[in-house]
């Protein structure tokens, strides 16, 4: 996520009043272990909400798409279903070992929901 200083005034902030991923903070920064991959990335998409509406356009030329991240039960599922809705015939995969949910139960529920929507979960 990328949120502004006004996060708590947003709809998300009112329903999830936990300031996180505020632009310019340590919690917003890319983890050091992932920084080399960002430098090689063709695109880095910032998203102010659960789903990245720019993601389908950025992924247009790919036949297979793998998603990982936090939180499985919020952002990962939102983006997996968003991309699957745009590209129902593309192979969309989520690597469960590279994801984590708010709770183990909500993580498992999100993975099950994605499987039901024809997102491959490994």
Question: Which ranges hold each PLM region?
Answer:
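Short, solvent-exposed turn/loop segments enriched in Gly/Ser/Thr/Pro and often Arg
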Residues: 1
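Active-site-adjacent betaalpha module
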Residues: 4-122
């Amino acid at each position: 996520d990328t949120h502004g200083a006004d996060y708590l005034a947003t709809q998300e902030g009112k329903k999830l009043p936990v300031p996180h991923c505020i632009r310019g903070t340590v919690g917003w920064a890319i983890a050091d272990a992932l920084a080399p991959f960002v430098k090689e990335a063709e695109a880095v998409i910032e998203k102010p909400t659960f789903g990245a509406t720019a993601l389908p356009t950025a992924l247009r030329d790919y036949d297979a798409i793998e998603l990982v991240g936090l939180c499985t039960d919020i952002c990962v599922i939102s983006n997996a279903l968003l991309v699957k809705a745009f590209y129902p015939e593309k192979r969309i995969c989520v690597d469960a070992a590279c994801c984590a949910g708010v709770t183990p139960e909500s993580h498992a529920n999100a993975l099950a929901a994605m499987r039901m929507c024809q997102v491959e979960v490994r």
